[in-house]
Amino acid sequence: MLPTGEGAEGQDWHLDMQLPSKVVLSAAALLLVTAAYKLYKSRPAPVGQAGRNNKDHKAENETEALGQLAFQEAPPGTLPRGRRRRKASKGAGTSLDYSLVDPEDPCILDISRSEEATRKGSDESQGRQCPDSQQVPPPCGGQEAGTDVRGKPNPPHLPHSGCEPTSSSGRLIPGVGGSCVGDKLSPWPDSRPPEETGSGDLEAPNGWTDLTLVNGDMNQSWIFTHMTGVSRGEAGVLQAAADMGLATQQQEGATNASHTFSSVARIRMEENIIQKAEGPGLKGRVYDYFVESTSKADSRPVPCPAALADAPSPGPGPEPLVTGAASRDEAANTAGGGASEAASPQPVASPSAPGFSRKVSLLQIAENPELQLQPEGFRMPLPAHLDQRAQLSSACSHGEPHVQLVAGTNFFHIPLTPASALDVRLDLGNCYEMLTLAKRQGLETLKEAAYKVLSDNYLQVLRSPDIYGGLSGAERELILQRRFRGHKRLVVADMCPQDDSGRLCCYDNVQDAWHPLAQLPPEAMSRGCALCTLFNYLFVVSGCQEPGGQPSNRVFCYNPLTAIWSEVCPLNQARPHCRLVALEGHLYAIGGECLNTVERYDPRLDRWTFAPPLPNDTFALAHTATVCANEIFVTGGSLRYLLLRFSTQEQRWWAGPTGGSKDRTAEMVAVNGFLYRFDLNRSLGISVYRCSASTRLWYECATYRLPYPDAFQCAVVDDHIYCVGRRRMLCFLADHISPRFVSKELKGFPSARGTLLPAVLTLPVPDVPQTPV
């Protein structure tokens, strides 16, 4: 029955509208089938199917691209990357085989297509790879190892000169005993990373091989076995490196020796494919493992300094000191063309310090502080037998302590006995060791000699934490007091910057005579310099250097016990015409030309720092300063009507008026708790005013009638105040009851050419030998 009318017309319209829908539906179905087919082909097959479809793999798989890795020299810690190859089979159940192949690598691991063949090859390799313990290492003794995990041979961790790769490709090239020898070596005893040692598909072919020393050298070579039984379901990279160093200390002609063994192992494993990752992108992981160990073995003490020699065997097994592990996850974007490719993460820096080279392991141990052993571990105790003068004369006949380098530390091995103690020359390098031995063995003569060396070079000892920190409080006070054994003398420096010459002379009050002491260094010659003594050292602060009159901030030091000039830390500011005083083991440089600042010197740190400045922005020029009752007093010059006082406890200045006359103040000194101020008057001469540091009440105590008196500077020796001028020298007796000038005029400084600067030093007895260092 035919439709008629409006019903037939509506049905024709419905048939006409279904045709475009069918086309769209067919196209969508075709795209869906294509996408499902591609997804099915790119799906990684289970591990068990790899062995069953081995023949189909060989017949149907075609290589699209070879990922190759060129083992070139690269900085330590970097991981060269190569193109990754994905081999896919058209058949069902095929597995993906990701690999990195180096066509120029002489040591390439070819993984078999089935687990059974892999395990069989592992057994055969294990049977072949049982080398003797005395196996000779190859000429290119690489300590860097690269092995294949899940189908990838990894590059060496560190480049090594002299081990260039050769151009070859193919299967594993057998070396010694069927193992791969060269730069590509397996770093673990069981040829697998620590996190996979328990996996069922991995087997350990062999352990470490022994270290062999050839011709007594320290060069070593390592032979590692390759890995078998790699899982086919994942792709990864294992990178390993192992370094070792052996320092041997052995007495020549004897069996006693000391061994220092250090080793470093680094493992990096990359998991580039994680099948259970969520999202369209694939993830990768990097595991870094670092193990460092060091150990030592000391034999019986030997009487003479041990000589550095090579030994054929290392010390005992290493003790792990530092271990670390790090992991990292990264997301990789999918590549075009429908093939998913895992983005390889960049190498992570190893947490360890730089390792040491295998060629010069001993030198690298000396350069790496983390591999060095403390000196206490190598200190030899004193021999029990005393008849060793012959041994000392034979081994240490040169008279100097023998110095040798073991793991970067200097050791002094001196067989010291009561009979041979006087034959050893002491200096700063061995005096503390000898002092320790002398106290242990009860050698009083040696102990006194060591104390003398420490005392004569007190500043160097003070700046050495190893020496000064090992002394007790009583010993520190003892070596300081020993510096003041001798005669306290007046010392005057004749500064003549015009002639670039100067001298240091001392005054003998018994004979009323002057004696030359030392020559001033040309660098210390300046106009407006200042002198002061601290710890029986003479410090000179430079003023203005000639020619040109440029201000200088240099500071020099003279040791009267060793007759040696040295330069210490310079000032922060140049201070011509400043005043220099010593208080509580520090130096204070006060004022200077247009300066109101103060600097303090710490001899233990050898450093100048700023102290509280002068109050009220008062600058001090042509002034004088002294120390009394643990306080600093400043007056005179631009401070004509002021007396400034500084307290170290409160770290502040006080300003007060001065008492007495309005005359010019030439000098101010302190004796026995009293301040003595010397004022000059053109008609009356010299007036002396005294003030107690506690009451601060000034009064005139003595005068010296002298028309037109010359300027002078003062220095205190016991209770005598010496007023040193160019034409004459006066002596003032600072008696508590009756202070007065000595009637006898003393002999003046002979042939003064420049400015005379007095100071006080304790000079040693001429017959006592000194120890210049």
Swiss-Prot record:
One of its GO terms (cellular component) is membrane. Its main location: membrane. Residues 340-354 have a biased composition (Low complexity). It comes from the Eukaryota. This is Kelch domain-containing protein 7A. It comes from Mus musculus (Mouse). The gene is Klhdc7a. The chain crosses the membrane at residues 23-40. It is a single-pass membrane protein. Keywords: Glycoprotein, Kelch repeat, Membrane, Phosphoprotein, Repeat, Transmembrane, Transmembrane helix. Residues 64-99, 114-207, 296-355 are annotated as: Disordered. InterPro entries: Kelch-typ_b-propeller, Kelch/BTB_domain_protein, Kelch_1.
